[in-house]
């Protein structure tokens, strides 16, 4: 239900300039995804209306969970850090001052342990089986005639939606505190970071081009 509502808000954001609705969209979608969709929107006639909806969701399954640990500065081609990657886990740690042969194991372990606590970010790819509806139309004319549909498509298909957390720096900021039952208090929300791996594919193409 929340995802269906998110697409309604996205449609409004891409069609109507409204400060309140814009703030709502920013709280639901990541800045990178929202900007990418807005850039694509600018290439179209500003008068057209865009409606993206998910009338029915039949099933949903977690596809992948991506975990990133370490300072976010480690992922900016920073030579002061080194990256360790395994499957969907990436860890950024301070680079060693010594070679692998010279560094003591205790120093290596301490370096990695500190890196784990410097920051944390989680992304979950969820594949949903749903009816997806797209509609691009011109607004109704002054005489009240029906809007002119320029493009329409509806069909049942798999849709991959990526949800992400904020980047917690340090990692323990993920938990704001504890309630009276000692349960963790979370003062953050998941955001939609990608749709059908749009940004992920573009990032991969960009890396291949280098």
Predicted regions mapped to residue ranges:
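Context-gated lysine
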Residues: 19-21, 26, 38, 42, ...
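A short hydrophobic beta-strand element
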Residues: 56-140
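Core segments of small alpha/beta cavity-forming domains
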Residues: 1-88
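Generic serine detector
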Residues: 11, 22, 27-30, 53, ...
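Compact beta-sheet-dominated globular domain cores
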Residues: 107-210
């Amino acid at each position: 239900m929340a995802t269906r509502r998110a697409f309604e808000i996205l449609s409004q954001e891409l069609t109507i300039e409204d400060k309140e609705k814009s703030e709502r969209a920013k709280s639901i979608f990541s800045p990178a995804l929202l900007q990418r969709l807005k850039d694509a929107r600018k290439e179209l006639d500003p008068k057209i209306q865009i409606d993206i909806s998910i009338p029915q969701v039949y099933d949903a399954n977690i596809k992948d969970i991506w975990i990133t640990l370490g300072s976010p500065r480690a992922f900016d081609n920073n030579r002061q850090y080194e990256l360790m990657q395994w499957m969907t886990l990436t860890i950024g740690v301070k680079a060693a001052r010594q070679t692998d042969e010279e560094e003591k194991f205790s120093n290596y372990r301490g370096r990695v342990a500190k890196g784990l606590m410097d920051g944390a970010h989680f992304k979950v790819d969820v594949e949903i089986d749903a009816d997806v509806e797209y509609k691009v139309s011109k607004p109704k004319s002054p005489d009240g005639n029906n809007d002119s549909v320029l493009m329409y498509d509806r069909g049942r298909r798999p849709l991959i939606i990526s949800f992400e957390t904020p980047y917690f720096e340090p990692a323990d900021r993920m938990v704001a505190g504890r309630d009276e039952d000692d349960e963790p208090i979370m003062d953050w929300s998941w955001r939609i970071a990608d749709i059908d791996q749009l940004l992920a594919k573009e990032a991969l193409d960009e890396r291949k081009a280098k």
